[in-house]
């Protein structure tokens, strides 16, 4: 299957959607795991309030076989290899998100922000999220402000941009700027430049949004060791353990890895 990467769109607007990056059957399998093993009420509307608003819509799952089957899919790696111009990459051990339709009393989505200091040229990375179900533009998915990305060379530090408690950099003054809400089909990958201000949007549809965060990039020794330790012990990487449910008492069984998966984890060296 041919996968199209709109690199010019990524360069101009700071994001791109890659259709069919992951087989739909792998997405369906992970959704099934969320429902049957993680007790996520995918089809039970009476319990959607349990995941109403951040951070309750983040699901503490990071080492399941169904996640690794997506991470180590060759097509997904090829996409990131094109972006980084090298095969020698590591993969993030991120989790899933289940965002039900918003109701009064639910928490608000995160504000538009950067996850990395946008003035630090050495911190530029590509970030990614896989849609596990069809996600309309009003369904709580990825949103961004391309005009701020396009004007990045004119940015300066000012009171309009602060850090929040999670050490994200907030884009406060965005009045009058277009906010783009990105729709996706199951299996699509949305990739964005870390210099693009973004967040999740409010789900004002009638169905949940389900997604899985997957990012690949060059991996230093500290990250490699943390990834391998997480896989071996079944515990999440240290920087997630302060989140609700992430320091679980019953750790994951180490997932079965392909040769590609072992290299992405950092267990084996790249040739």
Regions found by a protein language model. Give the residues of each.
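A short beta-loop-beta micro-motif enriched in histidine and acidic residues
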Residues: 113-125, 177-178, 184, 207
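Short, structured patches in soluble enzyme cores that scaffold and shape functional sites
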Residues: 95, 114-116, 130-134, 146
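Short, conserved beta-strand element in jelly-roll/cupin
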Residues: 119-137, 183, 215-218
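Non-heme Fe(II)/2-oxoglutarate
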Residues: 40-48, 189, 195-271
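Short edge-strand/loop segments of extracellular domains
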Residues: 98, 145-152, 215-221
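Double-stranded beta-helix
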Residues: 135-199
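Short catalytic/ligand-binding loop motif for oxyanion handling, primarily in non-cytosolic enzymes
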Residues: 27-28, 138, 153, 199-201, ...
């Amino acid at each position: 299957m041919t996968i199209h990467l709109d690199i010019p769109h990524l360069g101009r607007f700071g994001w791109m959607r890659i259709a069919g990056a992951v087989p739909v059957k792998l997405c369906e399998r992970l959704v099934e795991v969320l429902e049957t093993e993680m007790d996520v009420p995918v089809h039970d509307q009476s319990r959607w309030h349990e995941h109403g608003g951040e951070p309750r819509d983040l699901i503490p799952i990071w080492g399941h076989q169904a996640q690794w089957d997506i991470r180590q899919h060759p097509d997904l790696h090829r996409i990131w290899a094109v972006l980084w111009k090298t095969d020698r990459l590591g993969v993030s051990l991120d989790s899933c998100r289940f965002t039900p339709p918003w109701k009064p009393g639910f928490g608000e989505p995160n504000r538009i922000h950067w996850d990395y200091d946008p003035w630090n040229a050495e911190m530029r990375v590509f970030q990614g999220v896989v849609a596990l179900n069809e996600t309309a533009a009003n369904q709580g998915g990825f949103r961004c402000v391309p005009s701020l990305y396009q004007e990045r060379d004119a940015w300066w530090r000012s009171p309009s941009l602060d850090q929040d408690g999670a050490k994200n950099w907030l884009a406060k003054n965005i009045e009058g700027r277009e906010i783009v809400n990105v729709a996706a089909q199951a299996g699509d990958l949305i990739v964005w430049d870390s210099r693009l201000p973004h967040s999740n949007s409010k789900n004002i549809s009638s169905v949940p949004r389900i997604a899985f965060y997957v990012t690949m990039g060059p991996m230093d020794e500290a990250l490699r060791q943390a990834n391998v330790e997480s896989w071996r012990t079944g515990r999440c990487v240290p920087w997630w353990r302060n989140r609700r449910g992430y320091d679980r008492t019953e750790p994951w069984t180490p997932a079965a890895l392909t040769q590609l998966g072992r290299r992405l984890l950092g267990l084996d060296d790249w040739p």
